[in-house]
């Protein structure tokens, strides 16, 4: 099994390190043809407008949508969730539009208002998961086929729709590998 981490911008290294701790072969994906070399893909946190601009400049956006629509398992964190969303509230931004959610960018505030909390994620075990929110998006609406796996303050923060796992916080910034392990089970 080989897992790609989209390497255009953001928390690439942190996701690669988490995967290496789990003994997984990784590939930092920087070219469209590399999307065919991976069994699953992580879209890291970063800056979503920069990420979509780079994807378009590299002609990778359409290939990525095609691979996701054909079943490529994807794990998106923070800005990666914005990239995948079908709808963005009160903001005009290009996106991939493959996940049936509406998101609100930077909904928890600016960088200085970033915070940590614990969330319950029954799908990965009974112990609370340390969630780090940094300029995080808020999922304000989910489609009927979107499964909510975790919430914070009544808002979904971890959702799954088919082959897509989307997390508004940063699990890669913790030592807790349960969400990465959960994603690997989706890939198998």
Swiss-Prot record:
Pfam families attached to this UniProt entry: SNO
Domain of life assignment: Bacteria
GO cellular component annotations of the record: cytosol; glutaminase complex
Chain sites annotated for binding L-glutamine: 46-48, 105, 134-135
InterPro entries found in the cross-reference section: Class_I_gatase-like (IPR029062), PdxT/SNO (IPR002161), PdxT/SNO_CS (IPR021196)
Keyword Hydrolase among record annotations: yes
Protein keywords: Glutamine amidotransferase, Hydrolase, Lyase, Pyridoxal phosphate
Keyword Transcription regulation: no
GO biological process: glutamine catabolic process; pyridoxal phosphate biosynthetic process; pyridoxine metabolic process
Known catalytic reactions: aldehydo-D-ribose 5-phosphate + D-glyceraldehyde 3-phosphate + L-glutamine = pyridoxal 5'-phosphate + L-glutamate + phosphate + 3 H2O + H(+); L-glutamine + H2O = L-glutamate + NH4(+)
E.C. numbers: 4.3.3.6, 3.5.1.2
Chain's role: Catalyzes the hydrolysis of glutamine to glutamate and ammonia as part of the biosynthesis of pyridoxal 5'-phosphate. The resulting ammonia molecule is channeled to the active site of PdxS.
Subunit record text: In the presence of PdxS, forms a dodecamer of heterodimers. Only shows activity in the heterodimer.
Protein name according to UniProt: Pyridoxal 5'-phosphate synthase subunit PdxT
Species assigned in the record: Thermotoga maritima (strain ATCC 43589 / DSM 3109 / JCM 10099 / NBRC 100826 / MSB8)
